[in-house]
Amino acid sequence: MRIVRGKWAGRDLTSPNDFRVHPTAERVRAAVLDLLSPDLKNASVLDLFAGTGALGLEALSRGAKRADFVETRPASLHALKANVAALRVRDCTRVFKRDALPFAGALTTAGAYDICFCDPPYESRMLDRVIEGWQVTHFARVFVAEHAPGHELPRGGKRFEYGETVVTIYRAPKPPKVVPTEPTPSA
């Protein structure tokens, strides 16, 4: 596994020897980050269920400003920290050894992040719970969900299929424009 594009293109990433970890395939990662290209410059990124950190690190390679990673599995955390160290990005990353559900649930500020990647184990329904929370708070302007083809998500996202992997991208609604009104003269 390696970084596909950007300033670290071709750099290898460490991956844990754990059958429960399914890193996002390079071609899927490349396609998704290409779709997000206009959103990446100076973006703050959240990588939930981060695993190796490949999605967040790819975003940094392509111009994101900072990335936070949330992961609980020891083997994945070890690989993630090794990848952060190898790319020398400790100054613009934070690694949280936390459960992603309560972490995301604690995010109450709209737009706390520009982009959120969410890639929980396919067999779980944790993604549904994170999306429910995101739909209430919109803690990221763009929410990227990776899931199995048979996992139906709420409407409102744009769905992209890559074989046995589906990526659905949601965008937070833009706040209404406030148009200043001219003051009316008093009589």
Stretch-by-stretch model annotation:
Residues M1-A187:
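Class I S-adenosyl-L-methionine-dependent methyltransferase catalytic core
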